[in-house]
Amino acid sequence: MKIINIGILAHVDAGKTTLTESLLYSSGAIKELGSVDSGTTKTDTMFLERQRGITIQTAITSFQRENVKVNIVDTPGHMDFLADVYRSLSVLDGAILLISAKDGVQSQTRILFHALRKMNIPIIFFINKIDQNGINLPDVYQDIKDKLSDDIIIKQTVNLNLKPYVIDYTEPEQWETVIVGNDYLLEKYTIGKTLNIAELEKEENERIQSCSLYPVYHGSAKNNIGIKQLIEVITSKLFSPTQLNSDKLCGNVFKVEYSDDGQRLVYVRLYSGTLHLRDSVNISEKEKIKVTEMYTSINGELRQIDKAEPGEIIILKNELLKLNNVLGDKKRLPHREILENPLPMLQTTIEPCKSVQREKLLDALFEISDSDPLLQYYVDTVTHEIVLSFLGEVQMEVTCTLIQEKYHIEIETRKPTVIYMERPLKKSEFTIDIEVPPNPFWASIGLSVTPLPLGSGIQYESLVSLGYLNQSFQNAVMEGIRYGCEQGLYGWKLTDCKICFKYGLYYSPVSTPADFRMLAPIVLEQAFRKSGTELLEPYLSFEIYVPQEYLSRAYNDASKYCANILNTKLKGNEVILIGEIPARCIQEYRNSLTFFTNGRSVCLTELKGYQVTNIKSAFQPRRPNNRIDKVRHMFNKINLH
């Protein structure tokens, strides 16, 4: 059986979930249509999704037409969840990009198209809601050409009367897009030779698969118009890259979620080989798992299966598998660019209103962060506060609401802050000697710190031989340095430097590893006080599209939001501004652009990394440590004079 995995992507309220329901209904997978308004759809599984009316997690469902099975990965529909969209995109054989006939191409449509094109995923445009009043399809076509791609082919004629309908007929002039992309067809066409439909369709299909041509279809998901035609094109024009002739297993974990009863569900896309129940499968060179339960979606229902073929999406109940784990042979994964998940850029503290629910809150955060790599948390070992880090404020809002609605925990949070980092300004060294006041520890340590280029991270080297200082003491120094790097002079994590352990001395038998572990962060702090540190903050690279008449305003406003414009380009009636901006400023700049362009701007961003900030006073309260703080303060007092 042929298996196709598709995604349905759209801006909010374009009708994505309704289209999924309509595909299931028209194919016979379900007997009645669900409704987003009433919360009865197949794919919006979480209570929170039903309440908000937008899809937040990724659900899997399927339908079958003749000998073709189509798995639908219903991707998230909110900007703060694009990282989840990227993860889902990696398993797709094709995508339906939904465009509202009334609203046309929206900002998020362009962002999604950009991601799909970057990952070389074939795209079918579906113009939805053609049964609404005031529809002008030629304007929508032009909107697609201006904002997405000229390489489209209109595959239907549409009658917009009181009861709209579509006819599968491609106007002759539409084939010109196909002809001009093929030298052989263009030559035949130029000299007046007849082109038969078979060779045109062959070229069309090849270009769709190579992501250089985008067919356009029409309909109304709500009223089931044009859906059967869409099913036909999905099953006939999209193909899976699975290696049907390979007996070597290869599958990739792209999603983790928890059921209402706490079972951990792992979603796997199989690319080659066959997986059987009770198989033992490699997930690394030294680790295997045994498949004890295996499920897949069959006609909209989750069913247990004994065997899974290449191309299938399966669900395993497993505690070991993590996101992006590969089952079997990694070499058989298709070569497709994986867009990197951005790092969390904001943080806050989160506590339950009732202290008795603290353990329950930690359990909830474990499940949520296990499913979403953009959400991280830790318990401060000194203050015992729960610190939550995340990508955007909507993500925080959804997480907090989820904790309240699914886990029934009332919580309190502080105002989010940007996650800064620190880097030394210059090379420095510092040594604290044994038995030299105020050092109370039976240890001597000498460290040097050297700044490294941005993005280098922390590097560590020990110049003290193991013959002179044994491994347990060396390990203790490393542990102390690791702890010391958690808090710089401003209270933020240190990065982009090399730390060298240059000197160590112990007294036998009184010295212990604990002496070195306690002293190392104090020496490190003094070295950083000599070098000084500079604050770094997360930066984004951006491409901003604005109509030409707003260029001056967009350009002049850049400095107000600390944006640095590096280049400009003209594209049709738009100007593209290319540059970089602090992550803390992007939302305000984006909101401003949206306001003064009346929603006609688009802002594409990717995490660039940490850059030097012009913020001078971004202090984070230092976490106390009763075992070393008194000594720290004494050394700080001495070195001030």
Swiss-Prot record:
Keywords: Antibiotic resistance, GTP-binding, Nucleotide-binding, Plasmid, Protein biosynthesis. The keyword GTP-binding applies. One of its GO terms (molecular function) is GTPase activity. Disulfide bonds: none annotated. One of its GO terms (biological process) is ribosome disassembly. Residues 1-242 form the tr-type G domain. GTP binds at residues 10-17, 74-78, 128-131. The keyword Repeat does not apply. It comes from the Bacteria. Coiled coil: none annotated. CDD domains: Tet_C (cd03711), Tet_II (cd03690), Tet_III (cd16258), Tet_like_IV (cd01684), TetM_like (cd04168). PROSITE patterns: G_TR_1, G_TR_2. PANTHER family: RIBOSOME-RELEASING FACTOR 2, MITOCHONDRIAL, TRANSLATION ELONGATION FACTOR G-RELATED. Abolishes the inhibitory effect of tetracyclin on protein synthesis by a non-covalent modification of the ribosomes. Belongs to the TRAFAC class translation factor GTPase superfamily. Classic translation factor GTPase family. TetM/TetO subfamily. NCBIfam families: small_GTP, tet_protect, tet_protect_M_W. This is Tetracycline resistance protein TetS. The gene is tetS.
